[in-house]
Amino acid sequence: MLYQLLHTVLSVTGVTLNAFMMYLALTKSPKIMRPCSAIITIKTFTDILTSAMSFFVMQRIVTDGSSILVIPTGPCTRLGPTACYVGHMFMLCFLECNLIWMISSYIFRYYILYVRDPSIKSLVFVALCLSIPSFIHMAAWIRSYDPNEAFVVPDSFGLASSHLILGGHIVYRSTITLILQLFITSVLVLIAYAWIRNTLLSFAIKMGSDKNDVKNLNARLVKVINFQVFLPTFIFLGFFIFAAMFGRYITVNIAQYLVSIAFMFSPICSPFSYILFVPHYLNVITGNKKPAENRATDMCAVRAFKNPNVSVTMTNA
């Protein structure tokens, strides 16, 4: 019961924070920030779906290396094992899509910096294209799942017979595959972070490090990505807990609760990277109206510094 309560609090918090961030991005972003608001909207949308699936399943993951069991305790249990397995797969898939979109957002920032602002339609199209492989992969696993497949529950897990338990060959292979994919994608996020951070610093040098506006802009951009790179650490934490259980380095008594909880903190913390470090959104929340010239260093105004004839004066949305 305590685990379900904790999962509910985390899921509701994740949905609420990301819905609020989506509201800010859609309704409070000035015109000059539209490309970035689209990027933020897509990111928060996947975070909302991740949190919703977490609530739907409220899963524990147990393994000793020879078997992997998923114990759902959420609303999906009323619909049966297939619904819970679908929810389990959707949650892991949305987490992966979230990480992939983080990498894509870094690439888009480079594109905005050195080429031009992409259209919102192109951003949505790219997001859909990036999601398709993950969903096809997930659909293949779901199609192969057999809720009637027999499997053995090790006595060492201490699971009651009254629990709804998902197990078997497909659960084993799909879970270990997707968790490994999450780990690999998180590593790619770190690589992309190092690249975009160096790009921002190089841009500041090219534009002249003696310009205060460029200094402030890049400092804020670096703060955003520094915060965002912290998000995959929760995926790493969940992965290493799972790996420790898998290798029998830790007992399952407490570890079985920690994998999903660790994963949940990534969508919960994500909105703060924008709320805390994008001045426009922070000013909207605090009701602080700063002069237009101080607001010109928002995230998507960066390209204007390449051309001194371009005005970056922004107005409230």
UniProtKB/Swiss-Prot annotation:
It holds the Pfam family 7TM_GPCR_Srd. The chain crosses the membrane at residues 5-25, 38-58, 83-103, 122-142, 176-196, 227-247, 258-278. Keywords: Membrane, Transmembrane, Transmembrane helix. SUPFAM superfamilies: Family A G protein-coupled receptor-like. InterPro entries: 7TM_GPCR_serpentine_rcpt_Srd, Nematode_rcpt-like_delta. The keyword Protein biosynthesis does not apply. One of its GO terms (cellular component) is membrane. Its main location: membrane. It is a multi-pass membrane protein. It is found in: Membrane. Belongs to the nematode receptor-like protein srd family. This is Serpentine receptor class delta-26.
